[in-house]
From Swiss-Prot:
It comes from Plasmodium chabaudi. It is a peripheral membrane protein. Residues 353-370 are annotated as: 2 X 9 AA tandem repeats. This is Acidic phosphoprotein. The gene is PCEMA1. Residues 349-371 have a biased composition (Basic and acidic residues). It comes from the Eukaryota. Glycans are attached at N21, N112.
Length: 441
């Protein structure tokens, strides 16, 4: 027992004192707090913590100092002064400027205000006295300064401003053109003579002589000589007689002579000559000779001479002439339309005379028989007329002539253009020859 150290004794005493301070009724378990039983707190799920409301009006407590209950913290913000302020030598940042407490987290944060960034100014350190001294001037000094100023002299009215003038654009400076004289060396003329000049002469001239000129001489010239000249001699020369001089014959008189007279001569006269005159000669004259002997001379012989023989001879000649007109173009120009008209007129007169004699002799007995026979003859004559050319063929010929004339005009224009081109190339050849001679010198 004597060997117990002071450290153990001091620690025991210290623990006893702490136990007394923690529990006012003393320690029941001894000096060590580790053997003390802690009471368990019962947590009820039904009980809910109620929010504590702060009193609206707090009564003054004499024990506490004069404190104000603050529900929400309102930071003090300093607005930036717009006037010129005195700057500090050292930078200073206020603790309250731009401070905001977040209601959710409870932390304070600072707003980013561009006006407050930089040097901060303490409002209580502004030197207003210095500003007053600078701006304030006493009255005496002010009057002294005004007296020392020289008086203003009247210089008259202000000068009249210049009148605006029209805009004159600046003139463009003409850049002088430097003229260079090119001196050809000994090799250049030689190259020009052999390469450039020969290439121009050989290529251009050959193309003209071989290509263009041959085509003109062989193709165009031959076609002009064969086609155009031939058409002039054969067609155009013929058309002058037919269309130029003979237009009156073809269109004016000739239309009646060729178309109307032909139809009369071919259709009416043929039918009369072949049918009526033939029937008179063969049938009627024979019947008259057999039945009535007295009428043989009037109807038989008379009609044979007037209608039969005359019409037969005339009709054969007319048929040959018409065939020559439509078939042979060469003999068509040699025929005279007047002879053709006279023959047609004679045939018509002979037919009329024969018809008059027949009407007087026969009377009403042979009219029915003649009508039936005439119908058959007309059908035959219509078949003949269909085989012969009509007016449509003539119109086609005229259209073809017009087309040929247009083609001639086009070819003539081509000739003129070709001649102009040939003249141009001939001038070019002359120029090249002159240049070659000059270079040779």
């Amino acid at each position: 027992m004597k060997a117990i150290s002071l450290g153990l004794i001091s620690s025991i005493i210290f623990s006893i004192v702490l136990a007394k301070n923690s529990s006012g009724s003393g320690s029941s378990t001894g000096c060590f707090g580790c053997f003390r039983k802690k009471p368990k707190k019962k947590i009820l799920a039904t009980e809910v913590a109620k929010p504590v409301k702060a009193p609206e009006t707090a009564d003054f407590d004499p024990k506490l100092p004069n404190l104000k209950f603050i529900e929400e913290f309102e930071p003090i913000t300093i607005e930036g002064c717009k006037s010129r302020l005195h700057e500090l030598d050292e930078p200073f940042v206020s603790e309250t400027d731009g401070m905001i407490i977040d209601k959710v987290t409870g932390f304070s944060r600072r707003e980013n205000d561009s006006v407050l960034s930089g040097w901060y100014i303490r409002p209580y350190e502004e030197g207003y006295e210095n500003m007053i001294k600078v701006n304030f001037i006493p009255l005496r000094e002010y009057y002294k300064r005004m007296e020392n100023r020289p008086p203003k002299q009247y210089d008259g009215p202000p000068p009249i401003p210049d009148m605006p003038q029209g805009y004159v654009p600046p003139k463009k400076e003409e850049i002088p053109v430097e003229q260079y004289v090119i001196q050809l060396s000994e090799e250049d003329p030689y190259l020009l003579q052999e390469e450039d000049a020969l290439s121009l002469m050989e290529y251009d001239a050959e193309t003209l002589n071989e290509g263009d000129a041959e085509t003109l001489n062989e193709g165009d010239a031959e076609t002009l000589n064969e086609y155009d000249a031939g058409t002039l001699n054969e067609e155009d020369a013929g058309t002058t007689n037919e269309a130029g001089e003979g237009t009156t014959n073809e269109e004016g008189e000739g239309a009646a002579n060729e178309y109307d007279a032909e139809t009369l001569n071919e259709y009416d006269a043929d039918t009369l000559n072949e049918y009526d005159a033939g029937t008179l000669n063969e049938y009627d004259a024979g019947t008259l000779n057999e039945e009535e002997g007295s009428t043989t001379n009037e109807a038989g012989e008379g009609t044979s001479n007037e209608a039969g023989e005359g019409t037969a001879n005339d009709d054969e000649e007319l048929d040959e002439e018409v065939a020559s007109i439509f078939d042979d173009d060469e003999h068509a120009d040699d025929l005279s339309l007047l002879d053709y008209d006279e023959n047609s007129n004679e045939n018509q007169e002979n037919v009329k005379k024969g018809n008059e004699n027949e009407g007087e002799q026969k009377g009403n007995e042979n009219e029915g028989e003649q009508k039936g026979k005439k119908k058959k003859a007309k059908e035959k004559s219509k078949k003949k007329v269909k085989n012969k050319p009509t007016m449509t063929t003539k119109k086609k010929k005229k259209k073809e002539k017009k087309k040929k004339k247009k083609e001639k005009e086009k070819k003539k224009e081509k000739k003129v253009k070709v001649e102009v081109i040939m003249d141009h190339f001939s001038e070019m050849e002359k120029m090249m020859n002159n240049k070659i001679k000059h270079w040779n010198k």
